[in-house]
Each structure stands twice: as structure tokens, then as C-alpha cells.
């Protein structure tokens, strides 16, 4: 059981999606839930079906006291590395909340340096903390939608299928077609594809 920090009224949960993909932004979400308006079935977004995720995402947006998305683009990831870009995107999500939280719970083992709000990192937080579960769902739904949009632009890369992750199919497409402007140049398979073309 996770014990919430005492003495804080508004607690935000923050999570990121998209550290592993070779393409596109890393997307984060920050969520302050309403204790008087609970949401059933919150869990780590990776453990939910797409249908369930989409339904929960709508419910979170409706019932949460505040929610916001943040992002760091592929060129930022290449510039400052994926970990720093994830932390930057988390800060952006928190700063975009229409209500400022008193405390922030961050999934993982690192806290963004420039939050300026008391914070705690929670390993496996997307399983343990409802606010982080909610954030993981919003971030995952947002990023998957972006991959579906990219798929419409470049159907030959099959982004809707692999969501940009380095699957066998994605690596084959990279080798065959080369990298797009949206690909993360600092990631080894993309670097390799750029050298070939």
C-alpha cells in the first residue's frame, strides 16, 4: 500500500509515455483527482485494453479537478537525452495545470529539478497511486492518437501498429525506407538508418 504524504490537500500525479519509441515526442500528463468524485478501475495504462483506456481517459477528463498534458519533441530528446526530456515534459505538464498542486507524485525514481513544488518519486507509481495511473492513461491515449495521425501521413511505416516502438516491423521499415524528420536521431537504430541513406 502506498502512503500519501500528510498535510497536502491538492496532490498531482505525473507520468510519461514514450521513452522507448524511435519516433515522436515523449508525452506526459499531470492529474489532480477529485476525492469526492472517484473513478473506478484506474490502473497502469499498459495493463488496460485500448477500449478501457479510452473510456477511462474521458472519465478522468470529466471528473478530475485538473489535468494537463506536457511533451518534449524528438529534437529536444536528441539534444538533452530521453531522461532529461521526460523530466522536462513532466514539468511542462505540471505547470500547465489550471490549479497548482501542493504536492506532486512522480512515477519512477527521479523528480524533475525545476518543479518548484514539493515532490516524491514513486517506483511503480502507475500501479500504486491513482493519480499516477490516471496520468499514465491520459498520456498513453494522447501519444497513441499522435501515432495514428503519423500513420495517416506515412502509412508505409505502420505507426498505428507499433506506435513507434523498435519492433521488428518498425526496424525493417527504417532499413527499407529511411528515417523521417519525426524520428529521434540520437537513438541507435535511427542513427544506423541515417548512415545507410
UniProtKB/Swiss-Prot annotation:
<feature type="binding site">
    <location>
        <position position="107"/>
    </location>
    <ligand>
        <name>a divalent metal cation</name>
    </ligand>
</feature>
<feature type="domain" description="RNase H type-2">
    <location>
        <begin position="9"/>
        <end position="197"/>
    </location>
</feature>
<dbReference type="InterPro" id="IPR022898">
    <property type="entry name" value="RNase_HII"/>
</dbReference>
<dbReference type="InterPro" id="IPR001352">
    <property type="entry name" value="RNase_HII/HIII"/>
</dbReference>
<comment type="function">
    <text>Endonuclease that specifically degrades the RNA of RNA-DNA hybrids.</text>
</comment>
<dbReference type="InterPro" id="IPR024567">
    <property type="entry name" value="RNase_HII/HIII_dom"/>
</dbReference>
<dbReference type="GO" id="GO:0030145">
    <property type="term" value="F:manganese ion binding"/>
</dbReference>
<dbReference type="InterPro" id="IPR036397">
    <property type="entry name" value="RNaseH_sf"/>
</dbReference>
<keyword id="KW-0378">Hydrolase</keyword>
<dbReference type="GO" id="GO:0005737">
    <property type="term" value="C:cytoplasm"/>
</dbReference>
<dbReference type="GO" id="GO:0006298">
    <property type="term" value="P:mismatch repair"/>
</dbReference>
<comment type="similarity">
    <text>Belongs to the RNase HII family.</text>
</comment>
<protein>
    <recommendedName>
        <fullName>Ribonuclease HII</fullName>
        <ecNumber>3.1.26.4</ecNumber>
    </recommendedName>
</protein>
<dbReference type="InterPro" id="IPR012337">
    <property type="entry name" value="RNaseH-like_sf"/>
</dbReference>
<dbReference type="Pfam" id="PF01351">
    <property type="entry name" value="RNase_HII"/>
</dbReference>
<keyword id="KW-0540">Nuclease</keyword>
<dbReference type="GO" id="GO:0043137">
    <property type="term" value="P:DNA replication, removal of RNA primer"/>
</dbReference>
<feature type="binding site">
    <location>
        <position position="16"/>
    </location>
    <ligand>
        <name>a divalent metal cation</name>
    </ligand>
</feature>
<dbReference type="GO" id="GO:0004523">
    <property type="term" value="F:RNA-DNA hybrid ribonuclease activity"/>
</dbReference>
<dbReference type="GO" id="GO:0003723">
    <property type="term" value="F:RNA binding"/>
</dbReference>
<keyword id="KW-0464">Manganese</keyword>
<feature type="binding site">
    <location>
        <position position="15"/>
    </location>
    <ligand>
        <name>a divalent metal cation</name>
    </ligand>
</feature>
<dbReference type="GO" id="GO:0032299">
    <property type="term" value="C:ribonuclease H2 complex"/>
</dbReference>
<keyword id="KW-0479">Metal-binding</keyword>
<keyword id="KW-0963">Cytoplasm</keyword>
<keyword id="KW-0255">Endonuclease</keyword>
